[in-house]
Amino acid sequence: MKTKNYLSEAQNFLKRNTQVKSFDIVMHDCNGVGRGKIIRRNELLNLYKSGRQFPLSLLGMDITGEDTPETGLILEQGDGDIKAWPIPSSLKLLHNSKPPRGELFMNMYDIDGKKLLTDPRNVLENKIQDFKKKGINFYAAFELEFFLVSNELDEYGKLKPAKSILGKRASIKKTDVYSVDHLHGMLPLIDDIYEATKLAKIDAETIISEYAPGQYELTLKHQKSLLKAADDILRLKRIIRAQARKHGVTACFMAKPMENISGSGMHFHISLYDQKEKNIFAERNNEKINKNLNYALGGLSLIHI
């Protein structure tokens, strides 16, 4: 893998952002956890020229960051090296970071330059190519639910919803679903999230106060690039975490961080279209049921048999 063609991307970024002194270089494992390093400004161009080596076991860690011996990547293979390369167009300026910093995402390859199939982004890219060979394209979007929790635990040592930033109004036992007033209490944080997504060229749209206390949902605009949609949702989680820390609260994306109240999910909306921009599941010529839809339903049914 060579990214010399994209070297100008890094050069132009450095020229435009002379105040940036360091960069987060981030890869995502199979659990969606961002792993990587912080590099200094003087290392960026060489990263684009030569890549950066990482241990192979990085791809086999569990959600807590522990090695998983069952993968066979540790003792059996001696935890060899892989090489990470910058993903084109992923170099972004981080909002509200002091001193100013940048961030870029990385893709993983073996030492010979072949894409690693254990990199989840490479897996997705291969599947997209399979669909393209069949003349199928996508529209996709995510809706992300999350909690904003206090940095302090309750009297029982458990998580509790964060108080509003403005006014410090507590919402520990009160559900404020669709409450605009509740959102107003978090406006400084919400505004920073929107500013950060704008810098990252992520089309963030509606935010609501969700059903559980301290729970929110932020939607992203649908787009044709399924790969960018996946990159955007991973970056959005990093943005929300970072901006929450700036405002003295913690963002939590766990499915069920607090018992006895609703948990969080992540809705993924996807539509499949042919080369003429027509939905492949739509009925045509007065047919009773579209054959593609019939096959899709059959495939989903087989999963549960």
Task: Give short role names for the model-derived ranges.
Residues 1-206, 228-232, 249:
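ATP/Mg2+-dependent ligation/transfer catalytic cores
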Residues 303-305:
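Conserved small/polar residues in nucleotide/adenosyl-binding loops
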Residues 144, 210-218:
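Short, conserved phosphate-binding/catalytic loop or strand-edge motifs used
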Residues 125-128, 194, 237, 241, ...:
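Generic solvent-exposed, charged/amphipathic alpha-helical segments
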Residues 215, 220, 228-298:
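Acidic, glycine-rich loop-and-beta core segments that form the ion-binding/anion-interacting portion
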Residues 151, 209, 256:
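Residues that form or immediately flank small-molecule/cofactor binding pockets and catalytic motifs
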Residues 225:
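Positively charged, low-complexity, intrinsically disordered RNA-binding extensions
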